[in-house]
């Protein structure tokens, strides 16, 4: 899978509508900080984003969520997520379903902040509260 396609898929997965330059930069920073390779991300996406992931991938998810304002001090910020999602034109007609899913995931806590971010992301995926999973 080419990086651009992967970037779009991951961006949609993490609630951004497109892979804009700012988000691409955030992805690169989080990859470097958490020693996650493009191959690691491709493997995770190819496996259907299973809930079993290495700690560095969980921390990569935390990094992305924090930089987007969706995770603060280890707490999922459901309202910030909804504020981001309502600006994605492709999903405006699904906001009721998405809002329900986001709210279902808002109190999830993991064993640490990385685990929390990952569990929230898996919950959002399960509840079809993130673009690209409808």
From Swiss-Prot:
Localization (cell): Secreted
Effect of residue 13 to L: In strain: 357A, 774A and 786A
Result after altering residue 44 to L: In strain: 318A, 319A, 399A and 732A
Entry annotated with the keyword Lyase: no
Keyword terms of this UniProt record: Disulfide bond, Olfaction, Secreted, Sensory transduction, Signal, Transport
Effect of substituting residue 39 to D: In strain: 315A, 765A, 822A and 832A
SUPFAM superfamilies, per the entry: Insect pheromone/odorant-binding proteins
Phenotype for residue 22 to G: In strain: 868A
Effect in UniProt of substituting residue 126 to D: In strain: 705A, 740A and 907A
Domain of life (superkingdom): Eukaryota
Any single Pfam family the record assigns to this protein: PBP_GOBP
Single GO molecular function: odorant binding
Residues in the signal sequence: 1-19
GO cellular component: extracellular region; extracellular space
Disulfide pairings: 30-63, 59-114, 105-123
Any one GO BP annotation for this protein: sensory perception of smell
PANTHER family: GEO07291P1-RELATED, ODORANT BINDING PROTEIN-RELATED
Primary role: Present in the aqueous fluid surrounding olfactory sensory dendrites and are thought to aid in the capture and transport of hydrophobic odorants into and through this fluid. May function in both olfactory and gustatory systems.
Protein name: General odorant-binding protein 56h
Gene: Obp56h
């Amino acid at each position: 899978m080419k990086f651009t396609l992967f970037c779009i898929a991951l961006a949609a997965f993490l609630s951004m509508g497109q892979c804009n330059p700012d988000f691409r930069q955030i992805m690169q920073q989080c990859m470097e900080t958490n020693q996650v390779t493009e191959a690691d991300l491709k493997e995770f996406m190819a496996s259907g984003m299973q809930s079993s992931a290495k700690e560095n991938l969980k921390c990569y998810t935390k990094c992305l969520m924090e930089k987007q304002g969706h995770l603060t001090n280890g707490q999922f910020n459901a309202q910030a997520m909804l504020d981001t999602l309502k600006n994605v034109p492709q999903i405006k007609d699904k906001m009721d379903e998405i809002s329900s899913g986001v709210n279902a995931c808002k109190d999830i806590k993991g064993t640490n902040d990385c685990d929390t971010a990952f569990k929230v992301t898996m919950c959002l995926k399960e509840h079809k509260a993130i673009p690209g999973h409808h």
